[in-house]
């Protein structure tokens, strides 16, 4: 199972002060050195964290596959076609949300999406849809022409956090059924959202069905905590 590292929240820390550090590019280099299989970045319409130049720099400077998460808008599409990431993952987007709250509704937007992704296909850019683990959405993704789906694991993660084990088992079964159908239809299957060091073992049970996990917040959170002592010691060393 591959790991895609989402570095959005490195930019979130930077944008909290509207400054130049921490460097998103350096974070991508670190992820590559650590063995990550892919860098994931979400270029949101409001540019709340990742900026256009961040994506350009990572794409041109780091020899690692880039997965660009994006809303299916014409503006972001133009940028994506210029940068040419190895993959685009289409996600729903609301300006008022803190993070992506659910999957893209392929069923209701199939005709639009089928036309929207043509340019990516012509440019040999893999197209993935971020969807809830719903069988109808999986089938619609195949019909629309996607190469892959990324299953939204948010409800699974929330039920784990709340220790709602009945709902947790239901969500895990939904993920299993959706992944199984997707594989039968010839789609690549990825997953992400809310996966942590504590709940990942349950997702690993689906290793034969899910090929890749995209994880960001949990990794960055742990990096802040476990790197804090080292950073303080380094500063004290300089002072002394």
Curated annotation (Swiss-Prot):
The record marks 150 as: Transition state stabilizer. 3-amino-2-oxopropyl phosphate binds at residues 6, 17, 194, 216-217. Its EC number is 2.6.99.2. CDD domains: PNPsynthase. Transmembrane segments: none annotated. GO terms for biological process: pyridoxine biosynthetic process. It is found in: Cytoplasm. Keywords: Cytoplasm, Pyridoxine biosynthesis, Transferase. Pfam families: PdxJ. 1-deoxy-D-xylulose 5-phosphate binds at residues 8-9, 44, 49, 99. It is an enzyme of class 2 (transferase). PANTHER family: PYRIDOXINE 5'-PHOSPHATE SYNTHASE (PTHR30456:SF0). Catalyzes the complicated ring closure reaction between the two acyclic compounds 1-deoxy-D-xylulose-5-phosphate (DXP) and 3-amino-2-oxopropyl phosphate (1-amino-acetone-3-phosphate or AAP) to form pyridoxine 5'-phosphate (PNP) and inorganic phosphate. This is Pyridoxine 5'-phosphate synthase. It comes from Hydrogenobaculum sp. (strain Y04AAS1). The gene is pdxJ.
């Amino acid at each position: 199972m591959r790991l895609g590292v989402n570095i959005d929240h490195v930019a979130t820390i930077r944008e909290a002060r509207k400054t130049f550090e921490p460097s998103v590019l350096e974070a991508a280099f670190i992820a590559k050195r650590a063995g990550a299989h892919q860098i994931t970045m979400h270029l949101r319409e409001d540019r709340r964290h990742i900026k256009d130049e961040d994506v350009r720099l990572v794409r041109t400077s780091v020899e690692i596959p880039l997965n660009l998460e994006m809303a299916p808008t014409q503006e972001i599409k133009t940028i994506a076609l210029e940068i040419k990431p190895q993959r685009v993952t289409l996600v729903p987007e609301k300006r008022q949300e803190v993070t992506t709250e659910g999957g893209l509704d392929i069923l209701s937007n199939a005709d639009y999406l089928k036309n929207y992704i043509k340019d990516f296909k012509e440019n040999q850019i893999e197209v993935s849809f971020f969807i809830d683990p719903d069988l109808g959405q999986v089938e619609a993704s195949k019909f629309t022409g996607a190469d892959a789906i990324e299953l939204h694991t948010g409800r699974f993660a929330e039920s784990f956090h709340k220790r709602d084990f009945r709902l947790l088992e239901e969500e895990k079964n939904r993920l299993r059924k959706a992944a199984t159908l997707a594989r039968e239809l010839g789609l690549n299957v990825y997953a992400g959202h809310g996966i942590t060091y504590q709940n990942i073992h349950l997702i690993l049970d689906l290793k034969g069905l899910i090929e890749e996990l995209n994880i960001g917040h949990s990794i960055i959170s742990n990096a802040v905590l476990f790197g804090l002592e080292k950073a303080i010691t380094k500063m004290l060393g300089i002072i002394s």
